[in-house]
């Protein structure tokens, strides 16, 4: 992807809807902030019909649907996605992450690596699904989709 396209179509801000967020631990809040920072550092985000960015994104959950409010120069749209196709992936991702964090404390490096590979594989699968679900609405690269999936999970974290 050309650097020019990456500069023209990028997110400049990301906000998670406060009403969609549950109270979480300090570690989970830090993970949210890191995910947003990483997303803003490097992303490709090209809404269909928008000439150029940068864009502001607000993410939230409404009636078990993902709501993406996107604003940019001459562009303002709300995209709503059903989360049903993601339910199993989100559940499995949380389970493998919990196992991974427990393994860090008690397991061998080989066991930790195996769990980490599984976690990354699930993350990739969910990211590819997100790209498919956004087709015709918003184009992203895989890394941007991965970071967006992390934030979708952040909206589902419960304390």
UniProtKB/Swiss-Prot annotation:
Pfam family, one: UPF0262
Domain of life: Bacteria
InterPro entries, per database record: UCP032146 (IPR008321)
NCBIfam families: PRK02853.1 (NF002769)
Family per similarity comment: Belongs to the UPF0262 family.
Official protein name in the record: UPF0262 protein PHZ_c2197
Natural source organism: Phenylobacterium zucineum (strain HLK1)
């Amino acid at each position: 992807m050309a650097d020019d396209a990456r500069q023209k179509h990028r997110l400049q801000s990301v906000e998670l809807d406060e009403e969609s967020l549950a109270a979480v631990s300090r570690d989970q809040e830090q993970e949210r902030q890191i995910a947003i920072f990483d997303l803003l550092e490097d992303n490709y985000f090209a809404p269909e019909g928008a000439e150029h960015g940068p864009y502001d994104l607000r993410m939230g959950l409404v009636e078990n649907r993902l709501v993406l409010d996107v604003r940019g120069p001459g562009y303002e749209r709300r995209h709503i996605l059903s989360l049903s196709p993601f339910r199993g992936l989100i559940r499995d991702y949380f389970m493998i992450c919990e196992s991974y964090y427990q393994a860090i404390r008690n397991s061998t490096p080989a066991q930790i690596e195996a769990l980490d590979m599984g976690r990354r594989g699930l993350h990739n699968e969910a990211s590819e699904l997100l790209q498919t679900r956004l087709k015709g609405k918003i184009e992203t690269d895989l890394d941007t989709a991965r970071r967006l999936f992390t934030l979708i999970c952040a909206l589902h974290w419960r304390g």
